[in-house]
């Protein structure tokens, strides 16, 4: 086991380089042997040293001769189809690592936005200094979650639920962190449902496209051809990812009337809340519920105090990507 | 010894019987073999050729400087490397420089990948801690009841409206008539808070102050792009290299007299950032347009 990572550069110290060459050459031969044995295949290796005019070969001189002859009898195109030099091999590895990094960043971003979304739902939106990119990603995340919730609601409605169960669950819901008045006030009007549906349709189409791209990229394509194809897939994924998030917001921006209408709805709902409170006959119980919410929010705030730092850091990276 | 996973355990050195396992093993081990060969060439300046026939009788090969030259040298029993001419020397030097840059870039990307994985694990822990609070709406959607789902849906839609309104503030210049709606935004804020008390002017001022902080925050992000020197000649490096140094930026002190000026800067910053993003994508495409076997310059 090496105690620290080896810097990938030419070793300038002569004796150190010779020792490294000797050890690594032996390891390389061992790996060719293992590959050949495990998979029952034909393979050979030729290694020329700067210090020795005779090459090291595996399995043997005659073995290499046989493999090389077989290799050379193939058509020219087949020989070069999956042939790489060090430059080409490194480029392939860079492309692969870059794609893995991009996917990892996307996963981190989604997890972060899920956390932010749930914090905002319990009234902690002010603790994150969200910029336009954060708001865009958060809106996209909310829309995805709404799509899942809507799908689940349709499934439950189609299967049919007994009235008794609904009533008991409604009581359980009111015992939760969201009091009943909010549930009544937040019932969405028909127009809003229609709007959400149209947005979900777009999201569904986007999701339909993405898996195909990922499958295409993950398919073990030809090595030589793969390097040509991978950039296109990468660019396509990047553009689509960018377009998805961007279009969610642009769709809203292109309909300022809808935004104004939604704002008016919010005001109307607020008045409706006041009206409901006026009829309510047990103000003390209501006060108690508010107190519970505050306690819960405080607990959540304490446990999530680390989020702003993490969010800022990730935002910085996302900003440049 | 029976283990649940196949990590870190010895295997029999005999031909595998399972066909699909054999194919996967070949793919992984061939890749690792080529990686080791590449490292040997880089570290010790060796010349290498490896030829491998896959279980499907396709041929994979790796070589440095290239497969054909090493095979030719072997077949002809030529002890001297063909580097005697000046042209060959120059080409070798340039190739080494390119390979060195590629190695540096690869090391950098792998390092960032390591950092990103650690970040993901940290986020996972935060999520676990939040779930432990026992909020029912954070359970998987499949486990919620119908009435819970409908209430949850309403809250999500409300939150989406708030996010949309907040985002529109960043584009006030594009939709100036929407600024009038800010008072309604307070109403929405009240609803999401769960309290039914009308927010007073102090609360409104606080929100405006937070928005100003957001502007300052954005303003910090844009300056390093122009202030930092180029990160080598590598197109990737320019993008990747900015990230680590970004965190040392400071936030300028808040000055209420500069409120309007910062609002204008905000719009310009957005435009610059968008164009910068497009440039990044363009650079990315341009680089990958090179054919893999080309001898042209990497830059």
Swiss-Prot record, chain A:
Pfam families hit by this protein: SRF-TF
Tissue: Expressed in the central cell of the female gametophyte and in early endosperm. Also detected in ovaries, young siliques, roots, leaves, stems, young flowers and anthers.
The keyword Transcription regulation is assigned to this record: yes
Gene Ontology terms: cellular component: nucleus; polar nucleus
Keyword presence, Transcription: yes
Subcellular location: Nucleus
InterPro entries assigned to the protein according to its UniProt record, in alphabetical order: MADS-box/MEF2_TF, SRF-like_MADS-box, TF_MADSbox, TF_MADSbox_sf
Domain of life: Eukaryota
Keywords for this protein: Coiled coil, DNA-binding, Nucleus, Transcription, Transcription regulation
GO biological process: positive regulation of transcription by RNA polymerase II
An example Gene Ontology molecular-function term: DNA-binding transcription factor activity
Domain annotation MADS-box: ranges: 1-61
Stored SMART domains: MADS (SM00432)
Coiled-coil zones: 89-114
Role summary: Probable transcription factor. Controls central cell differentiation during female gametophyte development. Required for the expression of DEMETER and DD46, but not for the expression of FIS2. Probable transcription factor that may function in the maintenance of the proper function of the central cell in pollen tube attraction.
Self-association and partners: Interacts with AGL61 and AGL62. Forms a heterodimer with AGL61. Interacts with MEE14/CBP1.
Additional detail: Plants lacking AGL80 (mutant fem111) have defects in central cell and endosperm development.
Protein name: Agamous-like MADS-box protein AGL80
Organism: Arabidopsis thaliana
Gene from which this protein is expressed: AGL80
Curated annotation (Swiss-Prot), chain B:
GO cellular component: nucleus
Keywords, sorted A to Z: Coiled coil, DNA-binding, Nucleus, Transcription, Transcription regulation
SMART domains listed in its UniProt record: MADS (SM00432)
Protein's cellular compartments: Nucleus
Ranges of residues in domain MADS-box: 6-66
Pfam families noted in UniProt: SRF-TF (PF00319)
Role played: Probable transcription factor. Required for suppression of cellularization and promotion of nuclear proliferation during early endosperm development. The FERTILIZATION-INDEPENDENT SEED (FIS) polycomb complex is required for suppression of ALG62 expression at the end of the syncytial phase of endosperm development.
Protein known as: Agamous-like MADS-box protein AGL62
Species this chain originates from: Arabidopsis thaliana
Gene name of the record: AGL62
């Amino acid at each position: 086991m090496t105690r620290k990572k080896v810097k990938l550069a030419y070793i300038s110290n002569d004796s150190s380089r010779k020792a490294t060459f000797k050890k690594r050459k032996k390891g390389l031969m061992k790996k060719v042997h293992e590959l050949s044995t495990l998979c029952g295949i034909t393979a050979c290796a030729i290694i020329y040293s700067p210090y020795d005019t005779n090459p090291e070969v595996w399995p043997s001189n005659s073995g290499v001769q046989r493999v090389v002859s077989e290799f050379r009898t193939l058509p020219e195109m087949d020989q070069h189809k999956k042939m790489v030099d060090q430059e080409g091999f490194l480029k392939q590895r860079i492309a692969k690592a870059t794609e893995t990094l991009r996917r990892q960043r996307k996963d981190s971003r989604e997890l972060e936005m899920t956390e932010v979304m749930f914090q905002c739902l319990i009234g902690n939106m002010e603790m994150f200094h969200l910029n336009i990119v954060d708001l865009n990603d958060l809106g996209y995340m909310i829309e995805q979650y709404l799509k899942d919730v809507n799908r689940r609601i349709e499934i439950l409605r189609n299967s049919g639920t007994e009235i008794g169960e609904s009533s008991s669950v409604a009581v359980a819901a009111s015992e939760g962190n969201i009091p009943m008045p909010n549930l009544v006030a937040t019932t969405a009007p028909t127009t809003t449902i229609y709007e959400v549906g149209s947005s979900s349709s777009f999201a569904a189409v986007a999701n339909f496209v993405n898996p195909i791209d990922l499958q295409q990229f993950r398919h073990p394509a030809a090595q030589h051809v793969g390097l040509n194809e991978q950039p296109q897939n990468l660019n396509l994924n990047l553009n689509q990812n960018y377009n998805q998030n961007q279009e969610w917001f642009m769709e809203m921006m292109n309909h300022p009337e809808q935004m104004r209408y939604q704002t008016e709805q919010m005001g109307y709902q607020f008045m409706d809340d006041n009206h409901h409170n006026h009829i309510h006959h047990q103000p003390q119980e209501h006060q108690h519920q508010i107190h519970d919410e505050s306690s819960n929010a405080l607990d959540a705030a304490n446990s999530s105090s680390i989020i702003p730092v993490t969010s800022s850091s990730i935002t910085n990276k996302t900003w440049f990507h | 010894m029976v283990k649940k996973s196949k990590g870190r355990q010895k295997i029999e050195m005999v031909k595998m019987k399972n066909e699909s396992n054999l194919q996967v093993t070949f793919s992984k081990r061939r890749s690792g073999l080529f990686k080791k060969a590449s490292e040997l060439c880089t570290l010790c300046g060796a010349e290498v050729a490896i030829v491998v026939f896959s279980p499907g009788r396709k041929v994979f090969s790796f070589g440095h400087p290239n497969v054909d030259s090493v095979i030719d040298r072997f077949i002809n029993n030529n002890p001297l490397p063909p580097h005697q001419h000046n042209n060959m020397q120059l080409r070798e030097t340039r190739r080494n420089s390119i390979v060195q840059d590629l190695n540096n870039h690869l090391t950098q990307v792998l390092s960032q990948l390591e950092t990103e994985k650690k970040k993901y694990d940290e986020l996972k822990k935060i999520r676990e801690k939040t779930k432990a609070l026992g909020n029912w709406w954070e359970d998987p959607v499949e486990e919620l009841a119908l009435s819970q789902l409908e209430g949850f849906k309403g809250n999500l839609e409300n939150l989406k409206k708030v996010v949309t309104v907040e985002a529109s503030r960043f584009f006030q210049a594009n939709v100036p008539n929407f600024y009038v709606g800010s008072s309604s935004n307070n109403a929405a804020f009240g609803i999401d808070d769960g309290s039914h008390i009308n927010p007073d002017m102090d609360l409104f001022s606080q929100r405006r102050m937070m928005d100003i902080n957001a502007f300052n925050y954005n303003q910090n992000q844009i300056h390093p792009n122009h202030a930092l020197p180029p990160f080598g000649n590598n197109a990737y490096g320019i993008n990747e290299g900015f990230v680590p140094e970004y965190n040392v930026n400071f936030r300028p002190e808040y000055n209420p007299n500069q409120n309007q000026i910062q609002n204008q800067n905000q719009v310009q910053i957005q435009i610059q950032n968008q164009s910068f993003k497009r440039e990044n994508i363009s650079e990315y495409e341009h680089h990958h347009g090179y054919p893999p076997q080309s001898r042209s310059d990497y830059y």
